[in-house]
Amino acid sequence: MATARLNKAICHSYYLLFGLVGVGLLPPLVKSFEDSYGISHTTMGIVLGVGAVVLSLASLGVGVWYDRRGGRAALSATMLLCAVSALGIYFARSVVPFVALLLAFHLANGLGAVVSPLVAKLYAEERARGMNLLHAFQGVGRLLAPMLVAACIALSGQWRVAFVVSAVLFGIWFPLVWFGLKETPQVRSRQHHDTSFGAIAALHDRVVMLGVAGFFLLSGCEMTLMTWLPNFLESETQFGKTEALTALTAMMLGYTAIRIVLGLRRSRVTSLHIAISAIVLAAAFSLATRVSDPYLLYCLAFLMGLCFGPYWPSLAAAIYDYIPWGHGTLTGLFGIGSTTGAFVFVSAVGVLGDIVGLRYGLLIAPVCGIVFAIAYYACEVLARRNKPRIAPTCDV
C-alpha cells in the first residue's frame, strides 16, 4: 500500500512539472520566442507543430517500451533530457540552435507519456478518477506556468530564466524517480508474445481509432487556445502582456478546477456533458474575442477552460476501460492523435494568423470542440455495443 501511494505521488508530481516547466511552459512564451528570434506566426506555428509530432512519436515508442519493460527507466530519462534541453534553450542565441533544442525538449516530454499507463494501472477500477487527478496536477502546473514566466521576467528582465528553473526542477526530480518509483512485478514481467501486435491490432478496432480521432480533435480545441489566445490578445486587441497572461491563467484555472472536481467526486463524464460543454465553449469564445473589459475576459477564459478541461482524461479513461490491457501502446496511439492534431491545428492557426489574423484562425478551436463532442458520442455508443476484438498480448 505504501509503495502504491509513493508511485502515485511520483506520477502526479511529474505531471505537475510537465504542466509547470515542461511543454506547459511554452504557451506563455510564444510571443517572446517570435520577438527574440524574429519568427513569424507561420514559422512559429510550424515549429510548435513539428515539436508536437516529435512528442507523439516519442510517446508511441515509450508506450511500446512500457508494455514490455515498465516505465521507470523512461520516466527517469525524461527528467534528464528535459533538464539538459531546457538548459540548452537558455544559452541558445540564434534561431537554429533554439529550434533544435526546443524539439529535443518536446522529445523529452514525449517520453513522459509513460506516466499515463502507470496511473491507469495504479488506480485499476478507478481509472477515470486516476486520469482526472493526474491531469488535474498537469492543470495546476499549467495554471502556475504564466505566473512563473511573469515572475522570471519581472525579476531578471528575460524570459530565458524560466528554462533555468525548468532545468533545476527536472534535475532535482530525477533521483526521486530513479530511486523512488517501484514497479510491481506484474508491470515488469514479460510474456513471450510480440507486444507490437497490440498496436497493429488496435488499428483495426473502430472504438480505438475513433478515440484516436477524438484526441486529434480535442487537441485542435485546447492546444490552439492555449498556444495562440495569449498571442492574439497581445497582438490584435487593446490588451497587453499582463492581461494576456492573466487570461491564460484564468483559462488554466477553469481547466484544472473541473478536473479536480471530477477526480474528487469520482464522476464519469458522459457524451451529454461533452456536448453541452462544446456549445458553451463556442459561445464563450465568441464573446472573449470581442470584449474590451479585462475582468469579463478573465471570466470567459475561465469558462472556456472549464469546458475543455475534461476532454483528455475522460476519453482516455473510456478507452482504457474498453480495452483493459496494453495501455502503454494505447497511450502512444493517444499521443499520436493528440499531437498530430496539435501539429495540424497549431500550424494552421499560425498560417491563418498571417493571412487573415488570429481572430479568425482561432475559430478552429470551437469547431474542433463541437466535432469532438460528436466523436465522443459515437465512441461511447460503439463501446457499449461491441466487445474489443484485440487479444491481450502482454500482462499489463
Locate the predicted segments by residue:
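Pair of pore-lining "gating" transmembrane helices in MFS-fold secondary transporters
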Residues: 2-28, 103, 205-221, 302-306
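Extracytoplasmic gate region of multi-pass secondary transporters
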Residues: 26-27, 206-252, 256
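Cytoplasmic helix-loop-helix junction between adjacent transmembrane helices
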Residues: 101-137
